[in-house]
């Protein structure tokens, strides 16, 4: 197994490298009869694509998606859907200096240890460029779960957190940080600008919420909804931690405070919860509350400041990373986390239907 695929019934396989001619995904298990065209996918890729602001990498890619199979007369056929995105702005020469050197905190040494060779051009398969394929596949998944609304945003950048009391969903797509707090945007601009001037980078925290997830999706024990979400998010480049609901704060709480009390429902609902510390999942199964996931992303190690390392011969060297890179990879990770949420939920919907008939 090469582990380039994700999912059970709704499954996708990503392919391609950062500096190859193209990359893409093959989505398998999509139900037939759904209306699908490139126009359904492109808006999500546009949110992720590079070069959209001075706060992201200046690599310019249109990220224009092409549907190669699985769609006939505008509808899915139930057969594999192949999606392709061409790479058009590679500068492989920028990486010639690291062909024989290992960049600290990158996959260089680990890939060499596993495979005995590596594509050093932009990190090859380990590049965040691969996440474009996930976003494309996630756009297809959203069609399967049209009843669910998914919204991601940044809640922290460079150690600076948003003011939860100032949360405004309308602000999220009005700034380059996907930030719901207007006052935080100005602070984050300064943080990223200063990091770039200093030849450095900063980390971030992405929060993603899925609304209207039906109670019952998920499974106990070894296929829990929250474990599937955690695996999906931990597979994203630069993610070093995942929380569901209150996450680690739950360990600092008490049973009385952390329990999401239930009350008789209002009209049309089975139950009303008085809080959502669990993040919409208990015992691995959705409760019908919003599903809340947070991902911590490390600062990119692709910085212009010299870092101590070794070469393939084991000799001490200092590595300087050239090329064009994000000063904060967490910014463009927002649509990626959304995509992985969609892919997991589409899979869980089909699994729930297969198991229960509902």
Swiss-Prot record:
Q: How is the cofactor bound?
A: Reduced FMN (FMNH(2)).
Q: Name one GO biological process term.
A: amino acid biosynthetic process
Q: Name the reaction it catalyses.
A: 5-O-(1-carboxyvinyl)-3-phosphoshikimate = chorismate + phosphate
What Pfam families does its record include? Answer: Chorismate_synt (PF01264)
Q: Where, in this chain's numbering, is FMN bound?
A: 125-127, 237-238, 283, 298-302, 324
Q: E.C. number, please?
A: 4.2.3.5
Q: Which InterPro entries does the entry link to?
A: Chorismate_synth, Chorismate_synth_AroC_sf, Chorismate_synthase_CS
Question: Would the keyword Flavoprotein be found if you checked this record's keyword annotation?
Answer: yes
- GO MF, one example: chorismate synthase activity
Keywords per UniProt:
Amino-acid biosynthesis, Aromatic amino acid biosynthesis, FAD, Flavoprotein, FMN, Lyase, NADP
What GO CC terms are in its UniProt record?
cytosol
What cofactor does this chain's UniProt record say it requires?
FMNH2
Which Gene3D superfamilies does its entry note?
Chorismate synthase AroC
Per the record, the pathway is: Metabolic intermediate biosynthesis; chorismate biosynthesis; chorismate from D-erythrose 4-phosphate and phosphoenolpyruvate: step 7/7
Binding residues for NADP(+), per the UniProt record?
A: 48, 54
| Known role | This reaction introduces a second double bond into the aromatic ring system.
**Quaternary state and interactors:** Homotetramer.
Q: Which family does the record assign?
A: Belongs to the chorismate synthase family.
Q: What is this protein called?
A: Chorismate synthase
- Species of origin reads Zymomonas mobilis subsp. mobilis (strain ATCC 31821 / ZM4 / CP4)
């Amino acid at each position: 197994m090469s582990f380039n695929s994700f999912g059970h019934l709704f499954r996708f396989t990503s392919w391609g490298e950062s500096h190859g001619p193209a990359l893409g995904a093959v989505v398998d298990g999509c139900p037939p009869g759904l209306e699908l065209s490139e126009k359904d996918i492109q808006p999500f890729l546009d949110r992720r694509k590079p070069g959209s602001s001075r706060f992201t990498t200046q690599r310019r890619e249109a990220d224009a998606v092409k549907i190669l199979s699985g769609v006939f007369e505008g509808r899915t056929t139930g057969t594999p859907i192949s999606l392709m995105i061409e790479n058009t702005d590679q500068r492989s020469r920028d990486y010639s200096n690291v062909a024989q050197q290992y960049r600290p905190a990158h996959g260089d040494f680990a890939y060499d240890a596993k495979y005995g060779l590596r594509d050093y051009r932009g990190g090859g398969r380990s590049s965040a460029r691969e996440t474009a394929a996930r976003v494309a596949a996630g756009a297809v998944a959203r069609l399967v779960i049209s009843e669910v609304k998914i919204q991601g945003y940044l809640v922290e950048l460079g150690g600076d957190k948003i003011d939860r009391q100032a949360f405004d969903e309308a602000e999220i797509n009005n700034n380059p940080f996907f930030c719901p707090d207007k006052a935080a945007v100005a602070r984050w601009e300064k943080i990223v600008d200063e990091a770039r001037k200093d030849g450095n980078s900063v980390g971030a925290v992405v929060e993603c919420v899925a609304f209207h997830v039906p109670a019952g999706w998920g499974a106990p024990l070894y296929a829990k909804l929250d474990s599937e979400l955690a695996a999906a998010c931990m597979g994203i480049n630069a993610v070093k931690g995942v929380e569901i609901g209150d996450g680690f704060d739950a360990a600092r709480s008490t049973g009385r405070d952390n329990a999401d009390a239930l009350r008789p429902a209002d009209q049309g609902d089975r139950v009303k919860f008085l809080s959502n510390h669990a993040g919409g999942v208990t015992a691995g199964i959705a409760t019908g509350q919003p599903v809340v996931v947070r991902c911590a992303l490390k600062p990119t190690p692709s910085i212009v400041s010299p870092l101590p390392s070794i070469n393939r011969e084991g000799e001490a060297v200092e590595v300087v990373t050239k090329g064009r890179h994000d000063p904060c990879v967490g910014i463009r990770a927002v649509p990626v986390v959304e995509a992985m949420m969609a892919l997991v939920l589409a899979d869980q919907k089909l699994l729930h239907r297969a198991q229960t008939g509902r």
